[in-house]
From Swiss-Prot:
Enzyme Commission number, as recorded: 2.4.1.14
Gene name linked to the record: SPS3
Keyword Transmembrane helix: no
Pfam families attached to this UniProt entry: Glycos_transf_1, GT-B_Sucrose_synth, S6PP
Protein name: Probable sucrose-phosphate synthase 3
Swiss-Prot/TrEMBL catalytic activity: beta-D-fructose 6-phosphate + UDP-alpha-D-glucose = sucrose 6(F)-phosphate + UDP + H(+)
Regulation of catalytic or functional activity: Activity is regulated by phosphorylation and moderated by concentration of metabolites and light.
Subunit relationships: Homodimer or homotetramer.
Top-rank taxon: Eukaryota
Family: Belongs to the glycosyltransferase 1 family.
Entry's Gene Ontology cellular component terms: Golgi apparatus
Length: 1062
């Protein structure tokens, strides 16, 4: 039946139309059927079948299908076609109803899970309240509020950002990864990734840079060195502002707004956002390098020698939110999130259509990876910025990590200073996007407002035509009568933009067709066949509908336009007394509605999403149901025919448009982020001291080779002793420095007496600081009991160390680190039994990244990094977490099923492996415990933010702070000691603990030793395989070895990876 596949798509369209117009009939099938079309007296089997199975179907479309079915002379073949069509309708309907049932079950289960999570959280929170405080429970705190009361409450405790903030000199980081991002001649609409978000982030960066108190704004995006796109997207830096754009007091050598393009993924290819996911960590490492360099530069310019850290890191969309969360954790600075378009909302819409299974949707849109990135972003974000209230209630409300009611409870407790037991919810703030009005030419509201239009179409006799924009001519050439009011729609040819419904509404309303023209600006195209299937389908349907309704001369659909033409297009529609329409099925905000209002165009817009808030502010048009063709046509007809209403809407739009200006947006934005809990790296090193240390240890490095080769040369010409010892000469400055390196001075300042540990660490830290490369051993070899497998692990560690030191070039300034889920005591016992000195390693990352130690203390003791605990402490609530995990793990089994009361516990706390930032448990029955993704979901529903993982061959479960991990610990070393992640070599097996995937991606070099790890914990990671969306299948940064590879082969793979670039 391959030749009849068109029927499936056509019948799906019929089933989805849900139009009204068929009168219900109760006729029953007869033995003899007359198939002729007549006056309605004969039985119509097609009509009967569709009416019985799918109610409310328009028979006009069905009749056209019927004509194709009966288009044959052979009655037997005709009957077979009829029977086949009927069976297809039946099958599609059953499938649709099955999907609807599954959808309702899924929604019901999620509702129950959310209610259970909220109930558990409020029970735990109420335990420490007094009787008087218990009245402030969930039901009493959550009361409906009027918009005015809500605004007063939200802003009452906030200090409004004003011009007296100039002394702040902030550094703000924005991230928008996908699409084609540049400051001028933006290619909006060139593909589905280059839309309104690109314009928004560029204009936001410019507007923020002009605000008092903001010194520099960096907008991070992807660098693309491909012949498929313009060369400008390969430029690493693009300046968005000039000195004239910024406040005079804020200008400086590095001030202003910039686009910073970071290479990640294949540099010679332009990739859609769905393909970028495996390379997100590469971006994080590249962006981190830029931020560290810039913080140092800004520190020299405006920070009095101290680093100037980003005030906030603001991610836009899921991919940038994921990146911003990791950067926020690495730098310990606040994160802000704007979703723009949300994955759960998109998934719900696609499932309701019933045309794709969940697996097909995920394959096309990578929707599971996107949703998990959005959940992680919610975990890490201090503030979530939305365009509308509807986005908070109906879209973010779908996520595990945000509960409106629980958020209000936690906020009320925090306001009273009551313990929240480690539970957190991000704050939501509605801040409508701004608009740049500098290019808007407001026309006088006079009858002569169409003078330019009159000159274009002929002008007055004897007068010379005025110069008019080229795009006007491009649009006007389509029209038979260009004097009619113009209905303007401007969007990508995306199915969700609902352009075809608009065209049907226009085509089927004769009064509207006679009174107005329709202009469709649907991006840019050269050949429809070269577009994506979705865009091509919309454009093809548009052309067919124009032909169907014979709209030639009434509809314009130009192929090309520039971004600079858009204001002229708005002005053309306004000069014809036209209307702007946005009929999208759901519109997250609707920036084009604001642009149209600024140019004096009334609007007709969808009632779903952001236009509701815009209409409430501007009062400049009408809202419609985007599924109702008749309502769309009536609203358009009302505005173009009633001139008084048209003028009223035009004036209202102009009067209220200031509410959406960029200065207003940025003022509210800065007010909101100023209320975030500011945090930054805890160490603040004196610049002069650092410089002196750098000079001192630079000399140390220059003399190290001489010392290592045991060339005992006397500095003053005397012959040294046989053991190479030298008596320092007080008159020789070189000897003085060397003496200080061997015997650190004992400082007696009172303020340093309580910092003996830090002083001891100071003598060792610079060794790590001066390393050029770091080899990190992160192999997870454990036996069935979770003990380290010495037979597999020890030879590999020894061979790696031997391979690095066998090459003179690599041996120079190379250090070693070990990264493991074992606690420090167990790790040191293992190394001792393997006869490997702890001093071989510059750092030890223990307990799944919750602790960092350095050798070098007195008597060979290991000393903890004094700043690391505070660095990873964000949103860590240990006691509340322990109680909740114990309940969940002993009441819920794998798959989310409830366990019987009285069943033996599945976990036992492992106090020996726990520390202040790691809760460890021993697993008694690994076949019954929840997977990581299920446990993380249940913890999020209860407001708990953390990083759970199974390790040591699934015999242990460890829970560490949200942004702590073995991979994040490497970034901490980069931030703390400026040892670039790109110069790290991470050695892993081909499987490991459930955080194994995080160790593979990034700009560090990964060496995967095949066959080294036979037992792992990956089976307990997630219910579906998403590895291809997290780890790149091919990468120049990944090399492979066999477990029995000789030392020379190991050396060769290190050399090969050292040459790798993105």
């Amino acid at each position: 039946m391959a030749g009849n596949e068109w029927i499936n798509g056509y019948l799906e369209a019929i089933l989805d139309s849900q139009a009204q117009g068929i009168e219900e009939t109760q006729q029953k099938p007869q033995a003899s059927v007359n198939l002729r079309e007549g006056d309605g007296q004969y039985f119509n089997p097609t009509k009967y079948f569709v009416e019985e199975v799918v109610t409310g179907v328009d028979e006009t479309d069905l009749h056209r299908t019927w004509l194709k079915v009966v288009a044959t002379r052979n009655s037997r073949e005709r009957n077979s076609r009829l029977e086949n069509m009927c069976w297809r309708i039946w099958h599609l309907t059953r499938k649709k109803k099955q999907l609807e049932w599954e959808d309702s079950q899924r929604i019901a289960n999620r509702r129950l899970e959310r209610e259970q999570g909220r109930r558990d959280a409020t029970e735990d929170l109420s335990e420490d309240l007094s009787e008087g405080e218990k009245g402030d429970g969930l039901g009493e705190i959550v009361q409906p509020e009027t918009p005015r009361r809500q605004l007063q409450r939200n802003l009452s405790n906030l200090e409004i950002w004003s011009d007296d903030k100039k002394e702040n000199r902030l550094y703000v980081v924005l991230i928008s990864l996908h699409g084609l991002v540049r400051g001028e001649n933006m290619e909006l609409g060139s593909d589905s990734d280059t839309g309104g978000q690109v314009k928004y982030v560029v204009e936001l960066a410019r507007a923020l840079a002009r605000m008092p108190g903001v010194y520099r704004v960096d907008l991070f995006t992807r660098q693309i060195c491909s012949s498929e796109v313009d060369w400008s997207y390969a430029e690493p830096t693009e300046m968005l502002t000039t000195a004239e754009d910024c406040d005079g007091d804020e200008t400086g050598e590095s001030s202003g707004a910039y686009i910073i393009r970071i290479p990640f993924g294949p540099r010679d290819k332009y990739l859609n956002k769905e393909i970028l996911w495996p390379f997100v960590q590469e971006f994080v490492d590249g962006a981190l390098a830029h931020i560290l360099n810039m913080s140092k530069v800004l520190g020299e310019q405006i920070g009095k020698g101290k680093p100037v850290w980003p005030y906030v890191i603001h991610g836009h969309y899921a991919d940038a939110g994921d990146s911003a969360a990791l950067l926020s954790g690495a730098l310990n600075v606040p994160m802000v999130l704007t979703g723009h378009s949300l994955g759960r909302n998109k998934l719900e819409q696609l499932l309701k259509q019933g045309r794709q299974s969940k697996e097909d949707i995920n394959s096309t849109y990578k929707i599971k990876r996107r949703i998990e990135a959005e959940e992680l972003s919610l975990d890490a974000a201090e503030l979530v910025i939305t365009s509308t209230r509807q986005e908070i209630d109906e879209q973010w409300g779908l996520y595990d990590g945000f509960d409106v009611k629980l958020e209000k409870v936690l906020r009320a407790r925090a306001r009273r200073g009551v313990n929240c037991h480690g539970r957190f919810m991000p704050r939501m703030a509605v801040i409508p996007p701004g608009m740049d009005f500098t290019n808007v030419e407001v026309q006088e509201d006079t009858p002569e407002g169409d003078g330019d239009l009159a000159s274009l179409v002929g002008g007055t006799e004897g007068s010379s035509p005025k110069a008019v924009p080229t795009i006007w001519s491009e649009v006007m050439r389509f029209f038979t009568n260009p004097h009619k009011p113009m209905i303007l729609a401007l969007s990508r040819p995306d199915p969700k933009k609902n352009i075809t419904t608009l065209l049907k509404a226009f085509g089927e309303c004769r009064p509207l067709r006679e009174l107005a023209n329709l202009t469709l600006i649907m991006g840019n195209r050269d050949d429809i066949d070269e577009l994506s299937s979705g865009n091509a389908s919309v454009l093809t349907t548009v052309l067919k509908l124009i032909d169907k309704y014979d709209l030639y001369g009434s509809v314009a659909y130009p192929k090309h336009h520039k971004q600079s033409d858009v204001p002229d297009i708005y002005r053309l529609a306004a000069n014809t007394k036209g209307v702007f329409i946005n009929p999208a099925l759901v519109e997250p905000f609707g920036l084009t509605l604001i642009e149209a209002a600024a140019h004096g165009l009334p609007m007709v817009a969808t009632k779903n999403g952001g236009p509701v808030d815009i209409h409430r502010a501007l009062h400049n048009g009408l809202l419609v149901d985007p599924h109702d063709q008749e309502a769309i046509a009536n609203a358009l007809l009302k505005l173009v025919s009633e001139k008084n209403l048209w003028h009223e809407c035009r004036i209202n739009g102009w009067k209220n448009i200031h509410l959406f200006s960029w200065p207003e947006h940025c003022r509210t934005y800065l007010t909101r982020i100023a209320a975030c809990r500011m945090r930054h790296p805890q160490w603040q090193t004196d610049a002069d001291e650092v410089a002196a240390q750098d000079d001192e240890f630079s000399l140390n490095d220059s003399l190290k080779d001489v010392q290592d080769m045991s060339l005992r040369l006397s500095m003053d010409g005397d012959k040294p002793s046989l053991n190479g010892s030298l008596e320092p000469n007080s008159a020789d400055p070189v000897k003085q420095i060397m003496s200080r390196m061997r015997t650190p001075e004992i400082k007696s300042k009172p303020e340093l007496q309580g910092k003996k540990q830090s002083d001891n660490l100071g003598s060792k830290y610079p060794v790590l600081r001066r390393r050029e490369r770091l080899v990190v051993l992160a192999v997870d070899c454990y036996d069935n009991e979770g003990a380290p497998d010495e037979k597999a692990m020890v030879p590999m560690i020894q061979n790696i160390i031997k391979a690095v030191r066998s090459d003179p070039q690599m041996a120079k300034n190379s250090g070693f680190a070990i990264s493991t889920s074992m606690p420090l005591d167990e790790l040191t016992r293992f190394l001792k039994s393997a006869k490997i000195q702890v001093s071989e390693f510059d750092t030890l990352i223990c307990s799944s990244g919750s602790e960092v130690y350095y050798p070098g203390g007195e008597e060979g003791k290991l000393l903890p990094d004094p700043d690391y605990s505070s660095h990873i402490d964000y949103r860590w609530g240990m006691e509340g977490l322990k109680n909740t995990v114990w309940k969940l793990m002993n009441t819920t089994a794998v798959g989310g099923e409830a366990r019987n009361k009285g069943s033996p516990s599945l976990i036992q706390e492992d106090q020996a492996s726990s520390n202040s930032h790691c809760v460890a448990y021993m697993i008694k029955d690994r076949s019954k415990v929840m997977r990581v993704d299920d446990l993380r979901q249940k913890l999020r529903l209860r407001g708990l933010r953390c990083h759970p993982m199974y390790c040591r061959n699934s015999t242990r479960m460890q829970i560490v702070p949200l942004l702590a991990s073995r991979s994040q610990a490497l970034r901490y070393l980069f931030v703390r000691w400026r040892l670039n992640v790109a110069n790290m070599y991470v050695v892993v097996g081909d499987r490991g603990d459930t955080d194994y995937e995080e160790l593979i991606s990034g700009t560090h070099k990964t060496v995967i030793v095949k066959g080294l790890v036979t037992l792992g914990s990956d089976a307990l990671l997630r219910s579906t395989d998403l590895r291809d969306d997290i780890v790149p299948s091919e990468s120049p940064f990944i090399g492979f070895l066999k477990v029995d590879s000789p030392v020379k082969e190991i050396t060769d793979i290190f050399k090969q990876l050292s040459k790798a670039t993105a």
